[in-house]
């Protein structure tokens, strides 16, 4: 019995030591990341020439990510949802947002959180469009709502 308790203690200590080492190894791989929105490389979003994106970190096709995104002037995304939460900070222009509670004009320096599964409409200002930083807790998707 004493030997079993002792062995369980040893195994637990090894698991903890390995976990701490693994976490520290992950943290040491993190590096400072600086990207200028004006210098970023934007590409048109697949299937939509009115939206362009510049990946900052992660992969929006498969995982949590951060991107600079641009809506062309007057862009209308229509009613839709996303599976995962989306956090937005507008840099330039205006991100137009509407849901059942009303409409919002989200301007430079403003923050907007859209919960996953929340039905909403979004678009770009008619004159300036919108440039914003967008971050999500998972892959990006666009689910049209009728």
Where are these regions (language model features)?
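Bacterial N-terminal signal peptides that target proteins for export
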Residues: 1-10
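Solvent-exposed loop/turn segments at secondary-structure junctions
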Residues: 60-63, 75-76, 94-97, 119-121, ...
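Conserved short histidine dyad/triad with adjacent acidic residue
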Residues: 62-82, 115-117
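A short, N-terminal "cap"/entry segment at the start of jelly-roll beta-barrel domains
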Residues: 21-65
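Glycine- and acidic-residue-biased ligand/ion/polar-headgroup-sensing regions
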Residues: 72-75, 82-100
